[in-house]
Every structure is written in C-alpha cells, then in structure tokens.
Amino acid sequence: PVCLKVVEKLCAGKYPKQVIGSGEAARIMTGAPIPNGADTVVKQEDTDYGEGIVQIYRSQNPYDHYCPQGEDFLAGEKLLTKGLRMDAIRIGIAASAGCDRIRVVKKVRVAVLTTGSELAKPGTKLRPGQIYDSSLYLISERIRELGGEVVRMNSVLDEPEILKGRLREAARCADLIVTTGGVSVGEKDLTRQVLSQMGADKVFDRVFVKPGSPTALFRLEETPVFALSGNPFAATVHMELLVRAAIARWYGCDELFPHEKRGFLLSNFGKSAVSDRYIRGTESGGRILLPNGKERSGILSSMNGCNCLVKIEQGRANLREGERVCYIKI
C-alpha cells in the first residue's frame, strides 16, 4: 500500500485551508470542495481509514470520483427560455442556479358552465330522465392540468334567465369561459340564443370537424366564450383543439399547443370522413392503437387509457393497419 499524511479534514460546506503536497492527503466528505494540489479522490473503502497516516490499497486514475465545477452548467449559459411551463424539474434547475424569483405569466382564470336540465351532480340519486354531469369535472380538471385556474364551476338548467345570470357572473371573474351543451338546434339548446341576446359577438358558430361540429366561439364583454358540445367525447375533442390552443396562447407556451404529429395505425378504421374526424387512440413510439368499438361521441369510458386524438382527414375512408395518420397527444 501507499502511505499518505492526512493534513486536513473537509466536511461539506467547509472550504479547504491546506494545499495538498506530494505524499499528502485530506479526508473529504461528499459535497466538500477538493483542495488545491489534489488530483484524485480515493474511496475510503480502499483505505485503512487511518487518521494521521492513511494507507491506500488500490491504484487510482487522475480525477477519479470528481464532480467537476461547471459540469451541470457554465456561467452565462441559458438554462430556461421564455414560454416554458415551470414544472418541478425546471423550478429545481432555477434554484440550482441561485434564482429565488422567476417572472411568470399569471394563471388564466377559466369559468366552466355545463348546461342541461337533465344533468345531476355525481353522488346524488338519479331521477328518471337524468344523467350524471361528467363534462363539468372532465373539462375543469383538464383546464387545471393545462395550468389554468378554474374560478367557477356551474351546472345550469335550461332556463334562459338563469343561463344569462351565470354567464354574466363568469364574464366578471374569468379570462375565459367554457360552456358545454345547448349549441345544437333543439328547442332547449339555448346557449347561442342567450349569448346573442346578451350582445356577445359571434366569432364562429360551427366547425367542419366531427364530433362536435356545432361548436361555437363568442366574445362576451371581451371575454372569449367557447361553446362546446354537450357530448363528453365531442367536448373533449374541442377542449384539446380550441380551448387548449387558447390557453397555450395565453401563456405563450408552445409546449402546451396541440401540435399535430404523424404515426401509423395498428388497427383498421372503416368509417368515412365527410369532414375532418377525430377519434380516440393510444400512441406509443408513433404507433397508434384504436379502441375496439365504443366510438360514439357520447361515450367516455373507451377514453380510459387513450393518450391521443387521431385525425381522419376529410375524404379518407376504410383506413387499414399500417396507414399513416396525424394525431395530437393529450
């Protein structure tokens, strides 16, 4: 073995006072700075644990077990850019550079209103003709996942004056309003009618996309109102295509935007597309599996496990396994 004189003991947070000369060593703990003059670190398991004199039993290479200064990032290096969503990792990166404050965009405040006298709150007993209000919770939670703040959640009866009151309240407290239901042509489909009566400006009132083609966008007292379909999957599609895009624009965050990607089908799809159609799917490595059956726009259960919306372009029909398609990750 090689014998070295121990001239200093260094714990994390303590700066070295000695310069290590030939035949000398310092006992050092993980996280402590390496003293000048040293050129390698020996694991204590390879020594006799000596205090004044230490015996080294295994040869070392220069700079073994070093954590070089600047290996994570260098002075002046750009670590985070404008438009990124601050998650746990990015907050940790900022903290590791000594940043205690970061300029961020305030959370977008969103009001969610589901319309329909048939809607019942989960946990209550259904009366004849009622269904549970899944869209209120689905849309609200998705907005939170995208970084929004849900400032109001209301289920509204199919009564014009009640709906007007809820919309006025929402416009006063929210930057963005999302409604579901009441956008088709039924006698009790009141959302468009009520918004028009309130003087809301119509941006568009239909989209050439299925499901959810009656989807509309209004501006009420300068607050955008996305009026989505009452069918849960149709509402999900336009939550991703339109509302998500609006939230991404609010934050200036390209990561949140619903960008199209290209992949390959692992299963067949036999329906034709008169307009662009979006269907649910599960993507892995650019390969997309479609759920077996249960594709109607009112069905939500087959979305369990799905992580993308697959775009079937207008005019395409009878897609076969292996064909290329566009998709949006959820």
Locate the predicted segments by residue.
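A broad, low-specificity signal for short, low-complexity segments enriched in glycine/proline
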Residues: 4, 41, 71-75, 113, ...
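Flexible glycine/proline-rich
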Residues: 13, 34, 73, 194-330
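Short, glycine/charged-enriched hinge/interface segments at domain edges or termini
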Residues: 1-152, 293, 309
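Helix-rich terminal scaffold detector
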Residues: 103-228, 232-238
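Generic structural signal for well-ordered, non-membrane alpha-helical segments
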Residues: 40, 69, 87, 132-136, ...
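Predominant activation on well-ordered alpha-helical scaffold segments within soluble catalytic domains
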Residues: 44-45, 77-80, 91-95, 137-140, ...
